[in-house]
From Swiss-Prot:
Highest taxon in the source lineage: Bacteria
InterPro entries per UniProt: Class_I_gatase-like, GATASE, Imidazole-glycPsynth_HisH
Organism phylogeny: Bacteria, Pseudomonadati, Pseudomonadota, Gammaproteobacteria, Pasteurellales
Span of domain Glutamine amidotransferase type-1: 1-194
Organism: Mannheimia succiniciproducens (strain KCTC 0769BP / MBEL55E)
Function, as annotated: IGPS catalyzes the conversion of PRFAR and glutamine to IGP, AICAR and glutamate. The HisH subunit catalyzes the hydrolysis of glutamine to glutamate and ammonia as part of the synthesis of IGP and AICAR. The resulting ammonia molecule is channeled to the active site of HisF.
Name of the protein: Imidazole glycerol phosphate synthase subunit HisH
Alphabetical keyword list: Amino-acid biosynthesis, Cytoplasm, Glutamine amidotransferase, Histidine biosynthesis, Hydrolase, Lyase
Protease keyword on record: no
PANTHER family: IMIDAZOLE GLYCEROL PHOSPHATE SYNTHASE SUBUNIT HISH
Record's catalysed reaction(s): 5-[(5-phospho-1-deoxy-D-ribulos-1-ylimino)methylamino]-1-(5-phospho-beta-D-ribosyl)imidazole-4-carboxamide + L-glutamine = D-erythro-1-(imidazol-4-yl)glycerol 3-phosphate + 5-amino-1-(5-phospho-beta-D-ribosyl)imidazole-4-carboxamide + L-glutamate + H(+); L-glutamine + H2O = L-glutamate + NH4(+)
Subunit text: Heterodimer of HisH and HisF.
Name of the gene: hisH
Length: 194
């Protein structure tokens, strides 16, 4: 398992989540290491524009786009998997169709921060052993509205994609590394089931 070094603040907490599961995970920005990994994790905290600049500066965009092994994007990492983010009006990785936009104003404060229910497609391997409508921890102001790649949803005034999946690329808007036993189970499922 390689955690792609995106320079974001949650790298250590993501690695520690795998350590707690006794799953060997290494943080790397080395292209050869990333290409040879059996699984990849794309974390992200911050803005889409800053994250894409870091990936470009580290020559990682093409490597990520050409990955054939299972990859899990977390929070901003999931948003980067779509085609475009209105946060900075920046093209993203285009690993799947869709775009990321500011959560519509429904009177609820932004960012959406805290625990929220997640409803997933029945029998999806990413959510194996996790009860329907379980709670996960979110911190975000931008979201991907439900589309053909949505495998789980949550609601914050409007429904949004809590998880996406397309081919070997998966993403979660919530932070599994901060979501207790449900988050730990999801990370374990990613490693063992996908």
């Amino acid at each position: 398992m390689i955690i792609i070094d995106t320079g974001c603040a949650n790298l250590s907490s993501v690695k520690f989540a795998f350590d707690r599961l006794n799953i060997k995970a290494e943080i790397s920005r080395d292209i050869a290491t990333i290409k040879s990994a059996d699984k990849l994790l794309l974390p992200g905290v911050g803005t889409a524009m800053a994250a894409m600049k870091i990936l470009q500066d580290r020559n990682l965009i093409e490597t990520i786009q050409n990955a054939t092994q299972p990859m899990l994007g977390i929070c901003l990492g999931m948003q980067l998997m779509t085609e475009y983010s209105s946060e900075g009006n920046v093209p993203t990785l285009s690993l799947m169709s869709g775009h990321t936009d500011l959560i519509p104003n429904t009177g609820l404060p932004l960012p959406h921060m805290g625990w929220n229910k997640v409803r997933y497609e029945q029998d999806h391997p990413l959510f194996a052993g996790i009860e329907q409508d379980s709670h996960f921890y979110f911190v975000h102001s931008y979201a991907v509205l439900p589309n053909e790649h949505t495998i789980a949803t949550s609601d914050y005034g409007v429904p949004f994609s809590a998880a996406l999946g397309c081919k070997n690329f998966y993403g979660v808007q919530f932070h599994p590394e901060r979501s207790g036993k449900n988050g730990a189970q999801l990370l374990k499922n990613f490693v063992e089931n996908l």
